[in-house]
């Protein structure tokens, strides 16, 4: 198994990831929750792309192993997004009010391209997507 793949076995799944420059690093322990693509206008504006690929993990299983991200209140009092203050990489999303799941951008995870547990199961907010998105594929 490569270093970048999820570590499994008798214990829980552990994945690591971080930003482009390496300043922000983290590990997440626990099962994948709701891997999906979001095509909402907020995700599109933040990323400069037509959608973002999200996956949830138990909040209790998150550990920042490098610098923590800078948080931006996307929807003040409701939702924040975490990014690297140096390279600008988008890392995470957090709902306020006792959230038990943290959203991690799948592309921030090491080895995301070969981790079958991260394959998106749905496309959220298609009504806000670029009109051509549903035609691609």
Describe the function of each predicted region.
Residues 2-137:
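A short Gly-Trp-Pro
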């Amino acid at each position: 198994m490569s270093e970048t793949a999820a570590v499994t076995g008798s214990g829980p799944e552990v994945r690591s990831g971080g930003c482009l420059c390496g300043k922000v690093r983290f590990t997440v322990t626990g099962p994948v929750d709701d891997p999906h693509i979001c095509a909402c206008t907020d995700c599109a504006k933040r990323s400069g792309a037509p959608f973002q690929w999200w996956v949830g993990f138990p909040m209790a299983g998150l550990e920042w192993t490098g610098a923590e991200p800078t948080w931006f209140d996307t929807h003040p009092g409701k939702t924040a997004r975490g990014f690297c203050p140096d390279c600008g990489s988008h890392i995470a999303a957090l709902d306020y009010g006792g959230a038990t799941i943290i959203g991690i951008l799948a592309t921030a995870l090491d080895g995301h391209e070969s981790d079958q547990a991260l394959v998106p199961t749905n496309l959220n907010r298609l009504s806000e997507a670029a009109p051509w998105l549903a035609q691609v594929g």
